Each structure stands twice: as C-alpha cells, then as structure tokens.
C-alpha cells in the first residue's frame, strides 16, 4: 500500500472521528489552547532556564537527561498530588484538579520538546 493511500485512509478515519464526536474533538482543541496559554504565562514567569536546569538551550544528551529528570520529578509531584486527592476523596485547597491535569499534560509536551532537543530554540 502506498503512503498516499495510507494518508487518505488516515484522514478518512480522522474525519469520521471528528464527525462522530464533534463535542469531544472541539473540547480537545479548547483544552489544547488552554494548555498553550498556560505554558506561555508560566514561561514568562520562569524563563527557559528553569526546564534547562540552568541552560537556556537544551541541545546535548547530558542537558536532555538533566532536563528530563527535572520534568519527571515535577510530573511525579503532580501525579502524587492527584492520587492523594482522588484516592482520599479530598477537596483541593489550592489549585483545582483541572489545573493539575493541565500541568501534567504541559510537562509531558515540554519533555517531548526537550527529548527532541528543541527546547530554548
């Protein structure tokens, strides 16, 4: 099967999903936009060296490793908070569960950017 046919099949399946679940797909796009807005606000506060562990540009294997460790710790903090709140039926005192989910998603995207050595560029 050529890649052109594969692309057509993929686009057809994607369109069927979007057509069958329009509210779900629209909400996904809305959340993506919220994630990006939060990312921009936090980057304005923290700057790129926060993720780069002191380096503005993450472009070496060593910098990638250090940055991924830092991001993993931050993600784990959020996951542990989420587990504590949900397993113990607690109401959050500070940030909402929704904020926690968005933070985890943003950390995951940031980790991908770091992994691809595009952070700070």
Enumerate the predicted regions with their spans.
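Intrinsically disordered, low-complexity regulatory regions
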Residues: 1-121
């Amino acid at each position: 099967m050529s890649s052109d046919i594969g692309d057509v099949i993929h686009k057809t399946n994607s369109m069927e999903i979007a057509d069958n679940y329009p509210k779900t797909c629209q909400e996904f796009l809305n959340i993506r936009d919220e994630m990006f807005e939060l990312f921009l606000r936090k980057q304005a506060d923290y700057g790129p060296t926060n993720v780069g562990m002191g380096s503005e540009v993450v472009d070496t294997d060593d910098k990638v490793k250090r940055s991924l460790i830092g991001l993993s710790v931050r993600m784990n903090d959020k996951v542990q908070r989420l587990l504590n709140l949900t397993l113990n039926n607690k109401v959050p005192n500070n940030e909402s569960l929704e904020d926690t989910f968005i933070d985890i998603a943003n950390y995951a995207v940031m980790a991908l950017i770091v992994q691809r050595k595009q952070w700070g560029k």
